[in-house]
C-alpha cells in the first residue's frame, strides 16, 4: 500500500513538473547549454537549427555584422517595402540565442503585407515616419476574428504575438523606417497571399474558389499575379513579409 501511495504521489508531482516545464520548452528556441554555439554553415549534418562551430575556431567576426542596418533597403517594388534581416543566416553567432533583428523600409504608401511568423513574437518600433500596424486573432469561439490596430509615430512600440497574422502600412507622404526584434534566431515568415495563391504546385482552383467564394476564373487571375519570380512580382521575400514573392527577410516583412 505504501509503495502504491508513493507511486501515486510521484506521478502527480511528475505531471505538475512536466506541465509547467514543457510549454516553455516547446514555445521557444532550444536553450543554450554553453556560452555560445556559433552556427557552422559548412557542416553537412542536419539538425533543428545549426550544429556548433568548433569553439577554437570562433572569432569576434562570428558575432559581428558591419553596417547591417545602416543602409536603406530598396523599396522600388510592388509592395513599396524592403526588409533587411539579421537572423542566424546572416549572423552565425545568433545560433541558440533565440533572438533576431530586422530593419524595414517603407516608401510612401508602401506596406509590409499580411504575414505571420510561425516561430516568433515580434516587437517593432518606428524610427521615422508613421505606420498603421495591426494583427488579427485566431478564430474566436463564437466565430470571426478580432483585429487590433494602431497608428505609430517615431519612438512608438507595438508587439505582434507569435503566429498571428499582422501587417504594417506607411500611410504617410514620406518614407518610413522601423526596427523589429523577434524571439527566434530564425522566425520564419508566411506571407498570406503568396502562400495561398503562389504555392508550388498551386492549390486547386476548387479549393480556393470555395474558400474565397469566388469563381475559378478569378482564382486563375489572382494566381497569375504570383507566378512571376519574387524580384519581378514585388515585395521580395524575407524576414518580415514579402510582397508578391516569399521569404523571411528581403522584401517586405518581419
From Swiss-Prot:
Mn(2+) binds at residues 115, 117, 122, 166. One of its GO terms (cellular component) is apoplast. Residues 67-220 form the Cupin type-1 domain. One of its GO terms (molecular function) is manganese ion binding. Its main location: secreted. The keyword Disulfide bond applies. It is found in: Secreted, Extracellular space, Apoplast. Keywords: Apoplast, Disulfide bond, Manganese, Metal-binding, Secreted, Signal. Residues 1-27 form the signal peptide. SMART domains: Cupin_1. Disulfide bonds join 37-52. Oligomer (believed to be a pentamer but probably hexamer). Belongs to the germin family. May play a role in plant defense. Probably has no oxalate oxidase activity even if the active site is conserved. This is Germin-like protein 4-1. It comes from Oryza sativa subsp. japonica (Rice).
